[in-house]
Amino acid sequence: LFSGSSYAKNIPPGSGIGDVPANILILLDKSGSMSVRMTSGSGFMYPYSAAADSSGDVYVGSYWTYGIKKLTYATGAVDTSFASSGTYTGSGNCRSYYPMNIKIHNGYMYVASYYQHRVFRVNLSTGACDWNHYIRYARNIAIGNNILYATGYYGNAVIRNLSTNSNISC
C-alpha cells in the first residue's frame, strides 16, 4: 500500500533542462523577483489604503501592523528614513491604529485612524503631527478645493478649510 520510493517528474517543457528530474511545487518566475515575503519587516500585512505624493512616493496604511510605510518611487523599496525605521505608528492622538484612509495634500499626510477615533495630519518634511480631530470610527477622507472632508460611523464628520486651518461648521 505504501512505498518508500519517491519519484520525480521532469521539469515542464520549455524550461531548458527537461532531462533532469526535479520536484517542482510551483514555478513563478526565474528572475527571483517574487521571492520577497510581504509580511517581513519591509513588507505589508493587510494593506488598506494608499496615497501618492507629488514625487510619486507611495504611502501605504496597513491595518494589521497599525503602521504607515513609505515606498520610494525611484526604487520601489520601503524608505527606512521615513518615521521610525520606515513605519509611522504615531502616538497619543496621532496614533495610526487601523489607518482606514490616507490622503497626501501640500506636503501633509492626512490619516483616518479607525480605532483611534481620530483624523490627524502629519507634516511629511518634519514628521510632526500638528492637528487631530475626534471622529468616532474615522473612515473616509476627501480633499477638494483645499477643503478636507472626513467622516466616520454614526454621523461623525469634520470639514476643515486647509487654507486657514480652521474647521467649518455646517
Predicted regions and their residues:
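Conserved beta-propeller blade signature
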Residues: D57-G61, Y108-V111, I147-A150
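A short loop-to-beta-strand structural motif that recurs across blades of beta-propeller domains
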Residues: Y66-K70, H117-F120, G155-V158
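A short beta-strand motif characteristic of beta-propeller blades
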Residues: S40-S42, A77-N93, A128-H133, S166-C170
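Acidic, polar low-complexity linker/tail segments
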Residues: F2-T39
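Signature of short aromatic-glycine-proline-rich micro-motifs recurring in repeat-based ectodomains
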Residues: G43-A50, N93-K103, R136-R139
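Short loop/turn segments immediately following the C-termini of beta-strands
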Residues: Y63, Y114, Y153
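Residue-level detector of Asp-centered blade-edge/turn motifs that repeat once per structural unit
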Residues: A52-S54, I104-G107, I143-N146
